[in-house]
A protein has these predicted regions:
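Interhelical loop and adjacent transmembrane-helix boundary motif
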Residues: 2-8, 39, 52-61, 209-262, ...
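Membrane-interfacial helix termini and adjacent extracytoplasmic/periplasmic loops
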Residues: 40-45, 49, 54, 115-148, ...
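Loop-to-helix entry region at the N-terminal start of transmembrane alpha-helices
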Residues: 20, 63-70, 124-152, 196, ...
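Transmembrane alpha-helix signature in integral membrane proteins
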Residues: 35, 59-90
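Membrane-embedded alpha-helices of multi-pass transport/permease systems
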Residues: 25-28, 32, 81-85, 119, ...
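Transmembrane alpha-helices
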Residues: 14-15, 20-27, 155-167, 179-210
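N-terminal signal-anchor/first transmembrane alpha helix
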Residues: 1-29, 102
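C-terminal transmembrane helix and the adjacent membrane-cytosol boundary/short C-terminal tail
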Residues: 2-14, 90, 94-98, 160-175, ...
Length: 281
């Protein structure tokens, strides 16, 4: 099949440049102003790494960063486990009584406003505390449970879309050779959906790290996440330390994202080569 000719248009290039400018110019300005020596974030006074130094000596900021990263990592991991199970049920179990309701309940958090989700979870935790005495206090645990609730929906959608594209003949061949369903899943299915699992984990991690509304409802005294601290700081005036912290997060996320993309692309190419080699053999 002949490749379609690529039509290059100045208008298309201009629109592309404008789009990327709107996306990445604010990030570039953020990184530049993180090296501003002035306390006023909008007034340039020269290059300095002062705010990076003060950032690491700010106990409240470091505590919020540690709490947010811990919750995000744990929530993303649990969301991947639950999301994989949910995707397996939706894709592999076919039609069963209540399948539509199950799929709706899994994906409902995708279209639910954060305010409604946060309020509903708050009422749930308060009711449980009155009924069984748990949770005794709202804090890291309640935030983690809330983040797992809505992150699982995103992970399930990502993994289920990948599972629908898989060639089931490989799994069926393994079962014909005597492999148990559990062994087939861990040896064949899981490696093939691993790029989607990694993508889902990164997406869930980002969503959890970025959440403000839901965490504000279900958090308690002493459990202040990074978005909550940043939002409260911005209301009283933008702290230059926030620019430094945001620049570090951008750099880390960019590096991790590139590494994940590279590893997934290499794994996908290797998987395609292995399948082609197996079919030829």
């Amino acid at each position: 099949m002949n490749n379609l000719p690529v039509v290059r248009s100045p208008w298309r290039i201009a629109i592309l440049v404008i789009g990327f400018t709107f996306l990445y110019a604010p990030m570039l300005m953020l990184v530049i102003y993180s090296f501003n020596s002035s306390k006023l974030v909008t007034v340039w006074a020269g290059w300095s790494t002062r705010w990076y130094s003060e950032l690491f000596h700010d106990d409240a900021m470091m505590s919020a960063v540690g709490l947010s990263l811990t919750i995000a990592a744990l929530a993303a991991t649990m969301a991947c486990v639950l999301g994989t199970i949910a995707a397996l049920v939706m894709v592999r179990f076919g039609r069963f009584r209540g399948s539509n309701g199950f799929a709706f309940m899994i994906t409902a958090p995708l279209v639910m406003p954060d305010v409604i989700t946060g309020l509903a979870l708050l009422l749930l935790f308060v009711a449980l505390a009155h009924a069984i005495g748990w949770p005794a206090d709202r804090g890291m645990l309640t935030i983690w449970l809330a983040h797992v609730t809505f992150c699982t929906a995103y992970v399930a959608v990502v993994i289920s879309s990948r599972m629908r594209e898989l060639d089931r003949s490989i799994e069926e061949a393994a079962m014909d050779l005597g492999a148990t369903p559990l062994k087939v899943f861990f040896i064949i299915t899981l490696p093939m959906i691993m790029p989607a699992v990694i993508s889902g984990w990164l997406l869930a991690f980002t969503l959890s790290l970025d959440d403000l509304v839901i965490a504000s409802f279900v958090s308690g005294p002493g459990a202040t996440t990074l978005p909550m601290l940043v939002f409260s700081s911005v209301r009283m005036g933008v702290n230059p330390e926030i620019n430094a912290l945001a620049s570090i997060i951008l750099g880390v996320v960019g590096i991790v994202g590139f590494i994940a993309w590279y590893l997934m692309a290499r794994a996908e190419k290797q998987r395609v080569r292995d399948i082609q080699r197996a079919r030829r053999g």
